[in-house]
Amino acid sequence: MCPLRSLLLISTLVLLHHLPHLSLGRSLPTTTASPGRSCLDYSQNLLRAVSNTLQKARQTLEFYSCTSEEIDHEDITKDKTSTVEACLPLELATNESCLASRETSFITNGHCLASGKTSFMTTLCLRSIYEDLKMYHVEFQAMNAKLLMDPKRQIFLDQNMLAAIAELMQALNFDSETVPQKPSLKELDFYKTKVKLCILLHAFRIRAVTIDRMMSYLSSS
């Protein structure tokens, strides 16, 4: 029989992957920083930061159709990463009958796992999360550069969110092997940029929830 925790995790990941209309909900409790912060700490910090940024955008851009019901949902990681599939619990990813299978250990440079050793599937999961973060970080930085040129100076990206992305990427500590990403925004249209900001923030919050769930699962394994 499949472990209940694994089944709950995969159900959550699939739900987040297919249901983009998630509400912001209540703010998460503040995580106390410590010298040896784990990736779970960083993922919780990221989720708080993107939730706060999205909430601010919805308030500031209330006339830009910035709610989850109004936007056209888009996933910039589609066909580029496979985080939901890569982050399946090992017993579900490698054996349909959910029987325990042998794990091959790999040494990782990051400090997401205390031992420094992790299975091949977990390494794939963490690398996919890293690539997701990298893509969103590049996109948000390019978008913020354009927003800074807006004469109205209506909204800018919260530097706390950009810092939270960078911190988790640094904690994961993977060398990216993907082709350098080019931001999708090409024209200097501030209205379209703000609409795109809403779309990306909604998508990124969903991904941040998925990442936080996965880090929670790994930290308790």
Curated annotation (Swiss-Prot):
Record-annotated disulphide pairs: C39-C112, C66-C198, C87-C125
InterPro entries: 4_helix_cytokine-like_core, IL-12, IL-12_alpha
Cleaved signal peptide residues: 1-25
GO BP terms: interleukin-12-mediated signaling pathway; natural killer cell activation; positive regulation of activated T cell proliferation; positive regulation of type II interferon production; T-helper cell differentiation; type II interferon production
GO molecular function: cytokine activity; growth factor activity; interleukin-12 receptor binding
Domain of life: Eukaryota
Pfam families to which the protein is assigned, alphabetical: IL12
UniProt keyword terms in alphabetical order: Cytokine, Disulfide bond, Glycoprotein, Growth factor, Secreted, Signal
Subcellular location: Secreted
Subunit record text: Heterodimer with IL12B; disulfide-linked. This heterodimer is known as interleukin IL-12. Heterodimer with EBI3/IL27B; not disulfide-linked. This heterodimer is known as interleukin IL-35. Interacts with NBR1; this interaction promotes IL-12 secretion.
Entry similarity comment: Belongs to the IL-6 superfamily.
PANTHER family registered for this protein in UniProt: INTERLEUKIN-12 SUBUNIT ALPHA (PTHR48485:SF1), INTERLEUKIN-12 SUBUNIT BETA-RELATED (PTHR48485)
Name the record gives this protein: Interleukin-12 subunit alpha
Organism encoding this protein: Bos taurus (Bovine)
Highest classification ranks of the organism: Eukaryota, Metazoa, Chordata, Craniata, Vertebrata
Gene that encodes the chain: IL12A
